[in-house]
UniProtKB/Swiss-Prot annotation:
Reported function: May be involved in phagocytosis during disk shedding, cell adhesion to cells other than the pigment epithelium or signal transduction.
Glycosylation sites: S34
Subcellular location: Cell surface
Protein name as annotated: Sushi repeat-containing protein SRPX
UniProt keywords, alphabetically: Cell adhesion, Disulfide bond, Glycoprotein, Proteoglycan, Repeat, Signal, Sushi
Pfam families in the record: DUF4174, HYR, Sushi
Cystine bridges: C57-C85, C69-C103, C89-C115, C120-C161, C147-C174, C262-C304, C290-C317
InterPro entries noted in UniProt: DUF4174 (IPR025232), HYR_dom (IPR003410), SRPX-like (IPR043555), Sushi/SCR/CCP_sf (IPR035976), Sushi_SCR_CCP_dom (IPR000436)
Domain Sushi: 57-117, 118-176, 260-319
GO biological process: autophagy; cell adhesion; negative regulation of cell proliferation involved in contact inhibition; phagolysosome assembly; positive regulation of extrinsic apoptotic signaling pathway in absence of ligand; response to endoplasmic reticulum stress
Tissue note: Detected in fibroblasts (at protein level). Retina and heart; less in placenta, pancreas, lung, liver, skeletal muscle, kidney and brain.
């Protein structure tokens, strides 16, 4: 600043306010670089050649910030007493301290400032997942969410810490959207055993598996359970399982049951057919019989075989041919054994009133007689003029006499004897009997009850 001799002249050139301040400063503290700096470790001070000897506040430099100063003297006096500096931080940084600094008379700035990197709130860790960040929670850091196996990310996969100290997008979550897995067995095919229409089929109950938390509901079955007897046909079996998020997993398979069949048989004309099981399945047996007055020719029973063919020959019902030329009454009766019931009407003369009335009533009830397999045998007269008649066939007198003697039928009075299909004497009558009373008695016979069932199935009835 020149020699001491010229200092008074120079002081006269300074502004009055600055001159006053200079006069108040002790000369011993006025030395180059004596100004105190409020800078922190990340702040840098500097000096300019033109005012390095000015003993005022140190120059300001804020890391990650910009400084705008206005000195009262203008020009290069930006650290002189009274200088005001505005501090602004760069994007992504925030100011810690006052945004306005003033150079004070103690050669110190009015505050200490620093620009620190902005920081967003710590992200919440999503359940069943997590996230990875490039630079923690600081400004411009990118964080990417991820989920554990079995879970799907819902929301923004990537978020960024913004200048407003908030994360971009909405926080993500991990939800269980993957259905549980369940595997069913393969198709079950079975063939029914002989004389059966169902098959017992078993399998292991499938277990579900969840890729998320492994917690599942009970397995729900739709269809018959394992170990059941399955009828013929295709059967759909379905298993369903849910996880805790109500995702549903299903699997299906079929149980196929086949029944070997030979094809349906038909009852012979004027006959009956009774079959076991379903009538035409492997192992089923069909039995045949004929209505009254007809004899069965062919196989009385046929079985459906494993080669799907029926055993035996086709049965037919032929009109019964009674042989009246046999020598004994026993041989005559044997022809009716298990085939026909006999109602033997005996009279000493054809003019007998009871005989004529009874014969008239029986003729009117012919349908009931046929329905109950009853053959009427007439014994008319007394030996040697005795006549035996079965329908249109006439038996010899000697055979007719044997029949009377075998069954102990009175020779000189009207009487009737009812013989069942096993040759047993079931009832005797010495007077007229109404056909309905006769039929009611026969309908109580055990064998007759079986016949009634078959006739009902064949819709065989008498309308009169």
């Amino acid at each position: 600043m020149g020699s001491p001799a010229h200092r008074p002249a120079l002081l006269l050139l300074l502004p009055p306010l600055l001159l006053l301040l200079l006069l108040r400063v002790p000369p011993s503290r006025s030395f180059p670089g004596s100004g105190d700096s409020p800078l922190e470790d990340d702040e840098v001070g500097y000096s300019h050649p033109r005012y390095k000897d000015t003993p005022w506040c140190s120059p300001i430099k804020v890391k990650y910030g910009d400084v705008y100063c206005r000195a009262p003297q203008g020009g290069y006096y930006k650290t002189a007493l009274g200088t005001r500096c505005d501090i602004r931080c760069q994007k992504g940084y925030e100011l810690h301290g006052s945004s306005l600094l003033i150079c004070q008379s103690n050669k110190r700035w009015s505050d200490k400032v620093i620009c620190k990197q902005k920081r967003c709130p710590t992200l919440a860790m999503p359940a069943n997942g997590g996230f990875k960040c490039v630079d923690g929670a600081y400004f411009n850091s990118r964080c990417e969410y991820y989920c554990s196996p079995g879970y799907t990310l819902k929301g923004e996969r990537t978020v960024t810490c913004m200048d407003n100290k908030a994360w971009s997008g909405r926080p993500a979550s991990c939800v269980d959207m993957e259905p549980p897995r369940i595997k069913c067995p393969s198709v079950k095919e079975r063939i029914a055993e002989p004389n059966k229409l169902t098959v017992r089929v078993s399998w292991e109950t499938p277990e579900g598996r969840d890729t998320a938390d492994g917690i599942l509901t009970d397995v729900i079955l739709k269809g018959l359970p394992p170990g059941s007897n399955f009828p013929e046909g295709d059967h759909k079996i379905q298993y369903t399982v849910y996880d805790r998020a109500e995702n549903k997993g299903t699997c299906k398979f079929r149980v196929k049951v086949r029944v070997k069949r030979c094809g349906k048989l038909n009852a012979p004309e004027n006959g009956y057919m009774k079959c076991s099981s379903d009538g035409d399945n492997y192992g089923a047996t069909c039995e045949f019989s004929c209505i009254g007055g007809y004899e069965l020719q062919g196989s009385p029973a046929r079985v459906c075989q494993s080669n799907l063919a029926w055993s035996g020959t086709e049965p037919t019902c032929a009109a019964m041919n009674v042989n009246v030329g046999v020598r004994t009454a026993a041989a005559l009766l044997d022809q009716f054994y298990e085939k026909r019931r006999l109602l033997i009407v005996s009279t000493p003369t054809a003019r007998n009133l009871l005989y004529r009335l009874q014969l008239g009533m029986l003729q009117q009830a012919q349908c009931g007689l046929d329905l109950r397999h009853i053959t009427v045998v007439e014994l008319v007269g007394v030996f040697p003029t005795l006549i035996g008649r079965i329908g249109a066939k006439i038996m010899p007198p000697a055979l007719a006499l044997q029949l009377r003697l075998l069954l102990r039928i009175p020779l000189y009075s009207f009487s009737m004897v009812l013989v069942d299909k096993h040759g047993m004497d079931k009832e005797r009558y010495v007077s007229l009997v109404m056909p309905v009373a006769l039929f009611n008695l026969i309908d109580t016979f055990p064998l007759r009850k079986e016949e009634m069932v078959l006739q009902a199935e064949m819709s065989q009835t008498c309308n009169t």
